[in-house]
Amino acid sequence: MGVTCVSQMPVAEGKSVQQTVELLTKKLEMLGAEKQGTFCVDCETYHTAASTLGSQGQAGKLMYVMHNSEYPLSCFALFENGPCLIADTNFDVLMVKLKGFFQSAKASKIETRGTRYQYCDFLVKVGTVTMGPSARGISVEVEYGPCVVASDCWSLLLEFLQSFLGSHTPGAPTVFGNRHDAVYGPADTMVQYMELFNKVRKQQQVPVAGIR
């Protein structure tokens, strides 16, 4: 894999989530991007079981268990403000056995799914973020395949993002700053999706105006 940027696209004013997704995908197709299947990234939140916290009033910690269709044999466990563990798909079964330590948060499942597009050396994924039956937002993932060091290709990624996101082009992901000259890996992409999902969850708690 190459270096990837994951961002959220605001819903266009007067449009639905699905209509905004269609506007984005049409822009990509006009650029010459070709459809290459579909993708899905999902996340379920677990919190520390009350029985493990003791009586000192400790705050429980969160763990995010995630899957990415690009890595069908892997499961990603991201600890709050901590490391990312990459395990095989049986990790989900293990979580059931660890219910005395981690418990699934109620109605915590969130996912994004949509279409993959290939444009030259760029792989683009535009997805609809859903919680339960409701569409909650739009995710945009762009991967530049030939490079594995973020600092070597961010300017190129940024230029491509600007070509179809315009004024909604994101800044450099925080994970780039932490690993400026390090080799980029799948865990870095999952951290970005975790941040995006948490942002979408928080936005559901306050009214958000549409964009022009």
Curated annotation (Swiss-Prot):
Q: What keywords are assigned to this protein? A: Activator, Nucleus, Transcription, Transcription regulation
Q: Which Pfam families match?
A: Med20 (PF08612)
Q: Where in the cell is it found?
A: Nucleus
* Highest rank taxon of the organism: Eukaryota
According to its UniProt entry, the protein's GO biological process terms are: protein ubiquitination; regulation of transcription by RNA polymerase II; skeletal muscle cell differentiation
**Record flagged with keyword Heme:** no
Where does it mainly reside?
A: nucleus
GO molecular function terms here? transcription coactivator activity
What GO CC annotations are associated with the protein?
core mediator complex; mediator complex; nucleus; ubiquitin ligase complex
* Sequence similarity: Belongs to the Mediator complex subunit 20 family.
Q: How does it assemble?
A: Component of the Mediator complex, which is composed of MED1, MED4, MED6, MED7, MED8, MED9, MED10, MED11, MED12, MED13, MED13L, MED14, MED15, MED16, MED17, MED18, MED19, MED20, MED21, MED22, MED23, MED24, MED25, MED26, MED27, MED29, MED30, MED31, CCNC, CDK8 and CDC2L6/CDK11. The MED12, MED13, CCNC and CDK8 subunits form a distinct module termed the CDK8 module. Mediator containing the CDK8 module is less active than Mediator lacking this module in supporting transcriptional activation.
Task: Give the function comment from the record.
Answer: Component of the Mediator complex, a coactivator involved in the regulated transcription of nearly all RNA polymerase II-dependent genes. Mediator functions as a bridge to convey information from gene-specific regulatory proteins to the basal RNA polymerase II transcription machinery. Mediator is recruited to promoters by direct interactions with regulatory proteins and serves as a scaffold for the assembly of a functional preinitiation complex with RNA polymerase II and the general transcription factors.
Q: What is the name of the protein in this document?
A: Mediator of RNA polymerase II transcription subunit 20
The upper taxonomy is: Eukaryota, Metazoa, Chordata, Craniata, Vertebrata
- Per the record, the gene is Med20
